[in-house]
């Protein structure tokens, strides 16, 4: 029986409607996250941006996203309202900008994305109880659907060079989601942690640090690929924007497929650690191939393979990190990498006058991940008890 002041339970119909709308909004944030990377060739021409300045736009968006994850409070619905409100305001500023790039608007755009995505994830987790892991896997897949479909859905606006209409469509969708959250959503009761669980998590900072670095690098690679693949493909010989955007779509399609595959029993059969080792190796190999063979057809193939390899990586690392802490900063650490590596890619590209050299930044992130995994495997081998020597 609910005591006075407790939060009323949602009816099954309301819960289903809420899950549907929140999932649709989460998928929209997937498309909105990759939007800047897909539009970057057009926006660079419109606002006369160098690669370094274009990288700064990506940096501001993902920095805002990381800050949004940190700023997401315990009241998930209020954070959702603020997030979608910021998205609507920043999108209107971007839509009506003229000769100069609205740098501040992209920072607040990322802030809104970070708050909306993190609050949705935590609200679904609060409502799911013991099924929270499965729900998070489903949410990651839904987000990937939006990220995959986004580049193709943006193409009609790119063909007409009418990006303002795209921004206005997104503005209307964000306003609809804002209205739903403000009028229909209710805060869910949070699961409490026992003192023993908090104490156990406090003592695992040493185990958490490598996971944090891995998450920063994994999301940094994902953001750099998403942000620069269209531009890289365009310069490598895919002259039409449709063909260039196809590389980004193939990357997200590969990621979506792998997340779908690993949301089944496949992950349990292979094992989390074995999957982690294999995907990190695959990411590094595909990144090296991307800069080694910059032909249009090779880029399309490698983009799909890179997406397949990187797809399960962040959800897998997130599952390891959530065993130690379930706070919003866990979602923010990936955003730090997502802010740094796309910007660093643009800065290196401007310095060396070659985007191939710029893509050494995500290659370095892949190398860091491989080295960390090698060290972890060596430590596990050393810590393992020696097998008994059989007597003659």
Where are the language model's segments positioned?
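Extracytoplasmic gate region of multi-pass secondary transporters
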Residues: 36-37, 206-249, 253-256
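C-terminal transmembrane helical hairpin of 12-TM major facilitator-type secondary transporters
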Residues: 273-317
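Helix-to-loop junctions at the C-terminal end of transmembrane segments
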Residues: 66-78, 158, 258-271
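Symmetry-related core transmembrane helices of the 12-TM Major Facilitator Superfamily/SLC fold
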Residues: 165-183, 359-375
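Conserved MFS/SLC helix-loop-helix module at the cytosolic interface between two early adjacent transmembrane helices
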Residues: 66-98
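Interfacial helix-cap and linker-helix signal at transmembrane-aqueous boundaries
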Residues: 43-44, 75-76, 153-161, 233-234, ...
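Intracellular juxtamembrane helix-capping segments at the cytosolic ends
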Residues: 115-128, 311-324
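A late C-terminal transmembrane helix in Major Facilitator Superfamily
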Residues: 324-355, 361-362
